[in-house]
Amino acid sequence: MMTEQLPKLEAGEYPGGIWYYEPHTYQPYRYVLGRVGKHPLVCIGINPSTAQPGALDPTLKSVERLANANGFDSWIMFNVYPQRATDPNDMDKTPDRALCDENIRWLKAVLAETEPTMWAAWGTLIEKRDYLPGLMREMVALTREKNIPW
């Protein structure tokens, strides 16, 4: 049985400091955005907005504030679906399975390389697309396999 080759979570220097940011340049999708640390609060939302290192949106400013207030050394934002859309109504009507699979690979990498605590932050937006609950269950199952706390 072959072992899955996971991507390497690498920190880079961006405006405002050292960040995790995948992909490393602005794209119409985003897998990972967060501060570097060993014990992050990993927040899972529905889909990414335009936020990037050094230019956080109000949601990510709240994630950062909550992580700091609760003693985490860092935070990482993931999303159930990685397509960037400032309005969830603009998300793909059907999921791009390649994006979904890569999103899961990056979550596996974060779980393997850090000691996270998870935070479910998808709310009722999970109902925006029929495919979102299934993708969310895939992500939750990964954390349960590794006994990651929520």
Please state what every model-predicted region is:
Residues 1-57:
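Active-site and ligand/interface coordination hotspots across diverse enzymes
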Residues 40, 73-74, 149:
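Residues at the starts of beta-strands that form the adenosine-phosphate
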Residues 27, 57-64, 96-106:
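Short acidic (Asp/Glu) patches
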Residues 73-89:
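Short connector loops at secondary-structure junctions
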Residues 46, 80, 122-124:
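Short, well-ordered beta-to-alpha junction loops that form the rim of enzyme active sites
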Residues 85, 91-150:
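Glycine/proline-rich loop-helix segments at beta-alpha junctions forming the active-site rim
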Residues 49-71:
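A short mixed-secondary-structure module that forms the rim of ligand-binding clefts
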Residues 42-44, 76-78, 119:
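Hydrophobic/aromatic beta-strand patches that form the interior of the parallel beta-sheet core
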